[in-house]
């Protein structure tokens, strides 16, 4: 038997005695406030306590335990708590021990804390020990803010010298395999209720039988995620180097169709590194049938905490557990177990027979035939390594290829690396490694791991990473890509846990001068082209008549009010290719990881004015093209071209050149400037701008107390949330990962779906609708009060449109468009605050070309009729960086005016924000131009990319402050933040294992900087003035008599505002 509970009346069966409310009131209620189900405590439970009329955080419920504790002993405290009151956020609850001494100050020991919400019970656990026995020992529960009621269902305090460890286990279904071994699980058969067990984000209770010959079992209910279940801390009972056998008797209940997966998992927590999850075993359980779940594990290293837990069934299905045993085995037993289970290869590969040394065992063909070869093509194709390779022939589809099922060996939330060497029978095509996943609820997902351009001439490496958010019913990795009829050769194919990468340090940046032009002879002051050379067979010479002032954005960035150009320009003639033009080598002048701004005057000759011509400032970095800015020119005027770039890898040669117009068109360039930008100076300016745009003067006026008591009282003002909207892109699989969900909910208040609302996803085939993912994501957002953007109703770019729509014309296409917008907005009426109506209209023209000229405007009109409260947006990329001549701010403004002229109810301007090496002045210029439309501007898909996390953080800081400091910008959406779930490489803020990287830390620092904190005293007039950001605040007032805490809101606005604080 376990040790007795030293707390008296721990289940409140006898009412409130001998508990004592500390400065507040308490009473016992007999019904469960959160559920009509059986309560989680024993069947003898008397109900729960409500601690109310709390005016201080430390007020709660306490009990004197002096006579029932002793020095030198360790005690484990376990409580079941909740909160109640008029609030939505979670509240902190603490368990504390007060040690009172007659001859020395009182001590306080924090035992543990948790966060409770209004809708469910949570467990609060911890331990304490007493070194020297005090005069009085008091256990109490405290913590929620004043005004919030504290609910307590049970309290237990037990000595940790429980005799559970010494008991011989009962001969149950789950433990009779090892009747002589010692079970390290406490309370393995729930004969002592839920003692030593905890629920993981859900509820549980024990069903006890009145027949002493029948066992009890635990019921885990109110599960909203697959990973939620029952867990026990076994840290002190396992050791590295030993193997352990797990056996559990499990079942399921609820709306089960067929069987449901149940998993046994080990969680290894480390203070200095990411938490690891180790799959022990799995089984499939059905209603009313008990199944035995077995597996083995071994603890490597020395984790700070080891937790065993059971999880797996889909949300809404209850998990039943009758008994759990974990026995230590000998090393030899463990090795035999590994062999019997066909464990992965010795290097931790989860693929079996990766190099085909055992023939084609464990491999299968996905819509193709598999064969092994020592050579092909008369010995011209030989293995890249080893003695043989496999071929996938007679492929019937692009997705046909070699595959292996890894269901039994893959773990969720663990990063895997897949690598292969591939070759094609002929031609050149993309080869891709893909992971197919089917979940227990029949939902399917295809995860692209990596792709490479495969060739007939040589072997090429295919390498990438993947991670599973949820627990799969089936997981298969395969190689696909080339058209049917092309054979794919595979030399080896391995999948193994990825090695943890070393975080990047802040790079060393060589000394450089901000604003110094690194282009030689840019002004052409002496009338020669020294420093310049022609790229290609064109001719260069110096001409006169160009502007004598710097281009506008160069002036802004360099803070120069007067120009000093010579009025000369480089003229390139006899151009026979678009790439030909003036060039110079700048290898020694470019510093790694420095962001450079590009600015120049450009003009074209008369021969190119019959059609628009692109002019591009470009760099060739070891032969690779880097965009430095592009502008469209269709007249004889001088135009400014702007852009930016950064080089992050040592280069042997960096060449600057100007290119773009059609062959035969003369090209003129004047005043080309390339200079390092001073980001620190810009950020200092933006902070000042944000103070004007996002703050207002606030006067707190306090009432309810005597003026004499208020005068001189200290005040602490803490902003808890900035009202500036900040959101992120999420996908359906993301919300299966509790670590992802935790970061998202703590840092964002808006969401946009990556692809689940797009037409190609919701209706991949005509009449075949798929709204399941979107429905589940909307439900998730509503559950946590997350506002949503609808992205997108239509997409104008043809490559993003599903084949069946591409094949429609005329009235059939018009009807499909009408059905799409009607179905979507009727189905989700009022669910989305924004809609991107027709994505990327500056880059595509599918609907405009096939329907009448009013089609685009009609999309807006119909959407507004169906959901008049939703704000309707345009959405475009490269608006803010100068990289794309098709999507300049001027062209965007022209598109808006054209739609408005046709009656389209355009409500907002979306700038996607997929930006590289951003320059604040260029971004600000675009925002200033767009703001003339008088419409709200949102960054809708913001991400930045850099191989270095610190530089990535710098880029993100530039973009967030530019948005925050501009009065026309009303919100920012990130296009994701989690590694392996981003659309661009090197753009994540959180590593796949849940660790926040340096870029993510910068993001969190910026969020903290957007909060206002004030300490002061109430003035004689009973008020206190401060200037703070718009948003939610808490204020604490401490007078000579008492302390008061309340909340208030500073609404958006510029004029001073009075806020009445009633104490």
Swiss-Prot record:
Pfam families, alphabetized: CBM_4_9, Glyco_hydro_10
Record-listed E.C. numbers: 3.2.1.8
GO molecular function: endo-1,4-beta-xylanase activity
Enzyme class, UniProt record, top EC level: hydrolase
Domain spans labelled GH10: 711-1006
UniProt KW keywords: Carbohydrate metabolism, Glycosidase, Hydrolase, Polysaccharide degradation, Repeat, Xylan degradation
Pathway: Glycan degradation; xylan degradation
Top-level taxon of the source organism: Eukaryota
Gene Ontology BP annotations: xylan catabolic process
UniProt cross-references to InterPro entries, sorted A to Z: CenC_carb-bd, Galactose-bd-like_sf, GH10, GH10_AS, GH10_dom, Glycoside_hydrolase_SF
Gene3D superfamilies attached to this UniProt entry: Galactose-binding domain-like, Glycosidases
PROSITE patterns associated with the record: GH10_1 (PS00591), GH10_2 (PS51760)
Catalytic activity, reaction form: Endohydrolysis of (1->4)-beta-D-xylosidic linkages in xylans
Transmembrane parts of this sequence: none
Active-site residues, as the UniProt record annotates them: 840 (proton donor), 941 (nucleophile)
Domain CBM-cenC: 5-146, 183-313, 348-482, 517-662
Similarity section: Belongs to the glycosyl hydrolase 10 (cellulase F) family.
PANTHER family on file: ENDO-1,4-BETA-XYLANASE 2, GLYCOSYL HYDROLASE
Known role: Binds to and hydrolyzes insoluble and soluble xylan substrates.
UniProt note: domains: The GH10 domain binds to xylan.
Protein name (Swiss-Prot/TrEMBL): Endo-1,4-beta-xylanase 2
Native species: Arabidopsis thaliana
Upper taxonomic lineage: Eukaryota, Viridiplantae, Streptophyta, Embryophyta, Tracheophyta
């Amino acid at each position: 038997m376990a040790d007795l509970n030293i707390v008296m009346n721990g289940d409140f069966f006898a009412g409130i005695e001998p508990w004592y409310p500390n400065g507040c009131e308490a009473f016992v209620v007999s019904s469960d406030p959160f559920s009509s189900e059986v309560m989680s405590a024993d069947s003898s439970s008397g109900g729960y306590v409500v601690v109310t009329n709390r005016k201080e955080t430390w007020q709660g419920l306490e009990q004197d335990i002096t006579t029932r504790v002793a020095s030198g002993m360790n005690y484990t405290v376990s409580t079941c708590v909740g909160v109640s009151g008029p609030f939505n956020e979670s509240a902190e609850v603490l368990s504390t021990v007060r040690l009172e001494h007659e001859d020395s100050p009182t001590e306080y020991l924090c035992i543990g804390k948790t966060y409770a919400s209004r809708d469910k019970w949570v467990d609060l656990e911890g331990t304490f020990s007493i070194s020297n026995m005090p005069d009085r020992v008091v256990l109490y529960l405290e913590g929620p803010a004043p005004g919030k009621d504290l609910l307590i269902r049970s309290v237990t305090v037990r000595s940790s010298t429980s005799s559970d460890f010494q008991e011989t286990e009962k001969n149950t279904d789950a433990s009779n395999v090892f009747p002589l071994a010692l079970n390290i699980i406490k309370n393995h058969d729930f004969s002592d209720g839920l003692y030593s067990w905890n629920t993981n984000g859900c509820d549980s209770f024990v069903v006890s039988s009145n027949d002493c010959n029948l066992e009890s079992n635990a019921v885990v209910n109110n599960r909203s995620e697959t990973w939620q279940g029952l867990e026990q801390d076994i840290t002190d009972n396992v050791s590295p180097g030993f193997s352990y056998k797990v056996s559990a008797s499990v079942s399921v209940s609820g709306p089960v169709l067929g069987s449901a997966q149940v998993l046994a998992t080990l969680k290894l927590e480390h203070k200095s590194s990411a938490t690891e999850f180790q799959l022990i075993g799995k089984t499939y359980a059905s209603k009313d049938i008990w199944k035995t779940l077995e597996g083995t594990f071994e603890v490597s290293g020395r984790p700070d905490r080891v937790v065993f837990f059971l999880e797996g069934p889909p949300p809404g299905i209850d998990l039943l557990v009758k008994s759990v045993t974990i026995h230590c085995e000998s090393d030899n037993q463990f090795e035999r177990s590994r062999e019997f289970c066909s464990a992965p290869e010795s290097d931790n590969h989860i693929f079996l027979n990766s190099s085909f040394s055992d023939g084609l065992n464990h491999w299968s063909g996905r819509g193709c035939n598999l064969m092994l070869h020592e050579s092909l093509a008369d010995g011209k194709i030989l293995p890249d390594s080893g003695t043989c390779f496999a071929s996938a022939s007679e492929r019937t589809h692009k997705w046909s290829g070699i595959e292996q099922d890894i269901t039994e060996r893959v773990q969720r939330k663990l990063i895997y690396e897949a690598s292969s060497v591939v070759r094609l029978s002929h031609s050149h095509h993309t080869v891709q490694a893909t992971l197919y996943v089917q979940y227990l609820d029949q939902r399917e997902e295809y995860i692209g791991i990596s792709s490479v351009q495969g060739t007939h001439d040589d072997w090429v490496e295919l390498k990438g990473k993947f991670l599973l958010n949820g627990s799969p019913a089936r997981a298969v990795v395969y190689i696909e890509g080339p058209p049917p009829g092309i054979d794919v050769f595979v030399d080896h194919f391995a999948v193994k846990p990825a090695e943890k990468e070393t975080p990047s340090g802040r790079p060393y940046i060589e000394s450089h001068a901000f604003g110094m032009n690194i282009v030689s002879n840019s002004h052409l002051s002496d009338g020669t082209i020294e420093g310049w050379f022609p790229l290609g067979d064109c001719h260069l010479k110096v001409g006169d008549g160009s502007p004598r002032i710097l281009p506008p954005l160069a002036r802004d960035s360099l803070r120069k009010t007067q120009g000093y150009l010579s009025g000369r320009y480089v003229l390139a003639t006899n151009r026979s290719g678009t790439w030909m033009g003036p060039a110079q080598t700048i290898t020694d002048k470019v510093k790694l990881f420095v962001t450079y701004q590009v600015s120049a005057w450009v003009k074209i000759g008369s021969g190119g004015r019959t059609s628009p011509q692109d002019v591009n400032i470009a760099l060739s970095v070891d032969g690779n093209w880097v965009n430095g800015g592009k502008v469209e020119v269709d007249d004889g005027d001088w135009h400014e071209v702007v852009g930016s770039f950064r080089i992050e890898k040592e280069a042997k040669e960096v060449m600057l050149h100007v290119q773009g117009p059609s062959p035969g068109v003369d090209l003129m360039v004047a005043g080309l400037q390339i200079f390092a930008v001073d980001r620190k100076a810009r950020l200092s300016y933006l902070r000042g701008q944000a103070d004007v745009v996002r703050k207002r003067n606030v006067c707190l006026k306090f009432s309810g107390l005597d003026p004499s008591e208020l005068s001189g009282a200290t005040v602490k003002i803490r902003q808890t949330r900035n009202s500036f909207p900040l959101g992120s892109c999420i996908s359906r699989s993301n919300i299966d990962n509790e670590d992802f969900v935790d970061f998202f909910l703590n840092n964002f208040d808006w969401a946009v779906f990556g692809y689940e609302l797009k037409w190609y996803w919701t209706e991949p085939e005509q009449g075949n609708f798929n709204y399941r993912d979107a429905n589940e994501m909307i439900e998730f957002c509503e559950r946590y009060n997350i506002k949503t953007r609808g992205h997108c109703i239509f997409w104008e770019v043809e490559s993003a449109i599903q084949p069946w729509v591409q094949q429609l014309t005329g009235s059939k296409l018009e009807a499909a468009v009408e059905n799409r917008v009607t179905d979507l907005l009727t189905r989700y009426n009022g669910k989305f605050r924004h809609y991107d109506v027709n994505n990327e209209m500056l880059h595509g023209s599918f609907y405009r070309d096939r329907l009448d000229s009013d089609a685009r405007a009609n999309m807006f009109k119909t959407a507004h009729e169906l959901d008049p409260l939703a704000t309707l947006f345009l959405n475009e990329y490269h608006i803010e960086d100068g990289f794309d001549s098709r999507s300049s701010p001027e062209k965007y403004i022209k598109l808006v005016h054209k739609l408005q002229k046709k009656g389209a109810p355009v409500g907002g301007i979306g700038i996607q924000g997929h930006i590289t090496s951003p320059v604040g002045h260029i971004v600000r210029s675009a925002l200033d131009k767009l703001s003339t439309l008088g419409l709200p501007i949102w960054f809708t898909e913001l991400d930045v990319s850099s191989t270095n996390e610190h530089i990535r953080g710098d880029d993100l800081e530039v973009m967030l402050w530019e948005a925050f400091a501009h009065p026309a910008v009303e919100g920012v959406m990130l296009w994701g933040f989690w590694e392996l779930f981003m659309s661009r490489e090197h753009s994540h803020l959180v590593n796949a294992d849940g660790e926040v990287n340096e870029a993510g830390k910068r993001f969190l620092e910026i969020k903290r900087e957007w909060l206002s904190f004030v300490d002061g005293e109430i003035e004689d007039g009973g008020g206190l003035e401060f200037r703070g950001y718009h948003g939610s605040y808490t204020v604490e007032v401490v007078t000579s008599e008492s302390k008061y805490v309340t909340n208030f809101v500073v609404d958006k606005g510029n004029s001073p505002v009075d806020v009445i604080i009633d104490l």
